[in-house]
Amino acid sequence: IRDSVFQAASVHRQHHDPRRIQLCTLMNIKEGGCSENCAYCSQSSRYETHSQASKLEDLENVLVEARRAKENGSTRFCMGAAWREVGGRKRGFQRILDMVREIRGMGMEVCTTLGMLNAEQAQLLKEAGLSAYNHNLDTSREYYGKVITSRTYEDRLETIEHVRNAGIAVCSGGILGLGEDESDRVGLIWEMSRLPEPPESFPVNALIAIPGTPMEGQPPVKFQEMLRTVATARIVLPTSI
């Protein structure tokens, strides 16, 4: 693993300034009530968890948080909404477009994660000034069906394609600790390497086993496994953050 970490660090230095980091702030603009059945997620309406369904945040509330984030040094503001897709939420989507425009007007980058998008919605987000869109694959194609069945792997790849075609940076990664094995972690990275362009960022998350979800009993992922996955991703996806 030491050799992998050394190689990963060397590759990273070839493509990025190792002395620079970007501070991002994430805000949940719509909590709970999601119709999806992602087995790890407290936001799903199918499980009894601590999350309570809420309405989409008002524009001004979001702008207050964005201003605070900028004052604290963040250069990117990310907004997440717990729902399956944007479709059918015209008023809510318009409010999100207004959020994107206003926050870009503050001089910040803006990222959203809003579930599935079609090509038109992706283009509207681009025109509003969206910098990046997060849509994780979660795990390998082979293991995916054991984590979620309400949305297909191809659905996720299609949204990523719409985002990329609109000229928005793609943020897409996965979660470790879902019960997958090493081959699934390799499979996830392999899927990313097959995209026409590598994602701008490849987040590697560790599962927080939340009571009430089907994965509440999963043990924490080991640090060495996390480190090995991050190192492998750096080597295979050298330009991704």
Give residue ranges: language-model regions.
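Flexible, acidic/Gly-rich N-terminal and inter-domain linker regions that tether
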Residues: 1-40
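Active-site beta-loop-alpha junctions enriched in small/polar residues
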Residues: 28, 44, 82-84, 109, ...
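Alpha-helix N-cap and loop-to-helix initiation/capping positions
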Residues: 54-57, 88-95, 148-155, 180-187, ...
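Non-catalytic positions within long, well-ordered alpha-helices that form the structural scaffold/packing
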Residues: 67-71, 126, 164, 193-195
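Conserved C-terminal portion of the radical SAM core fold
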Residues: 76, 81, 105-106, 154-213, ...
